[in-house]
Amino acid sequence: LFEVRLLLEGPMPRLPITALFEGVTDQAILSFMKVALKAHASLAHSGEVWYRGQANKDWNLLPGLFRSGKSASQEERAYREWTRRAELIEKPEENEWNHLFNMQHYGVPTRLLDWTESFAVAVGFSLVFSNFGETSVPRVFILDPCALNKRTTGRDRVFEIPEDKTISYRQTYLEGRGIMPTGPVAVRPSSYTLSNRRADNQAGVFTIHDNSGQPVDAQPKSIVTSFTIEKKQIPGARLFLKLSNVNAYTIYPDFGGLAGYIRAMLTNESK
């Protein structure tokens, strides 16, 4: 994304790539990129940058467990039931974190919030689930995970899970043993993505939240910021996705994603 600065700081070029979308002008894609770069500029930029696309600009950055009002006792029951029954479906999984990642992956409310290391994937999520701005105004959040962890744990790094033994999901968050970080913590499921194609394609990472239920967007704007994709920027954002080869199938590399990709292809051909 930052390579686009060179384009924005120089004279306005004529971009033949806009011919891929009828009616999309150079100004449309540059308008979208300028908004994104302006949001990036407000971060502390201590190292990595993560993204999250949401269909509705009014939604907070809360994980499913706190959006649904589930209690800690229900979380423990759900985890226990998952670990017991999951062994009947696949080979036994010994790692506590991989159980949690699988629960999140398949839609069980957890204290995890999904993020991605791919700007294009975040833009894709926000546009697709807002019907490209027709049902709501999409928003893309931008997070400095190292700055977040510095604030909530005192450690200026992302925790690589499960290799990093500093944090235990079961002991710290379920059983209440030890000291729970005050606020969300950025974690990377380093080995989990190797066995999960969807998580790998989405460049998936997470924040794990404490019992306060505080949303990530309550953090200072030097740690997390955002921008909305307004109606006038939608054409430029759609072209950006096309150039980035982001579609339903690249995000969801399974039969459901393939079906969504083909539906979109047929819809475009019928216009």
Describe these PLM feature segments:
Residues 8-271:
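Catalytic-core elements of nucleic-acid end-processing and repair enzymes
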